[in-house]
Amino acid sequence: MKVLKIILTITIFFSSVLLAKYDKKVDPTELYQKATAHLDKEEYRKANRVLGKYTKSKPKDPDGWTLYAFTQRKLKNYKKAESFYEKALKIDPDNKIALEYQGELFVETDRIGLAQVNLNKLKELCPTSCDELEQLKKYINKEQIRDVKQRV
């Protein structure tokens, strides 16, 4: 009987510890910081998992969707990446980072014309230039140079 009480006590203790662990509220700020730390180390799979949780907790944050799309793109999940960039841009159509990264996705999937559309939108948003505009220009030019070299 004494052994049974000990086993029961241990079971209850560990059950409450496990429940407390899984019952803990997810802090979106903490998730975002964790994801960006993974991105800084180019740990795209880890960042992707964290950003999945983040976007569930903050579904109206265009930056979360943009980073989630970015990790999908880096993992070569182009359809998911495209869908997530679209979500980010639906929330904030003038999100320069989403426009740049979506343009890079278009380049990577051989849709230079669509990348040019994003470039033109960035030109409207940044009449005197901005980092996103310059980065997308470079990305498109680099791809066009690579195509020319392959043809020669």
Regions found by a protein language model. Give the residues of each.
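Alpha-helical segment of the N-proximal tetratricopeptide repeat
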Residues: V26-S57
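Helix-start (N-cap) detector for alpha-helical repeat units in TPR-like alpha-solenoids
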Residues: D27-P28, P62-D63, K96-I97, S129-C130
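Register position in tetratricopeptide repeats
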Residues: D40-K41, K74-L75, E108-T109, L125, ...
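Canonical positions in the second alpha-helix
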Residues: K53-Y54, K87-A88, K121-L122
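Structural marker of alpha-solenoid helical repeat scaffolds
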Residues: S57, I91, L125-T128
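Canonical tetratricopeptide repeat
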Residues: L67, Y101, Q135-Y139
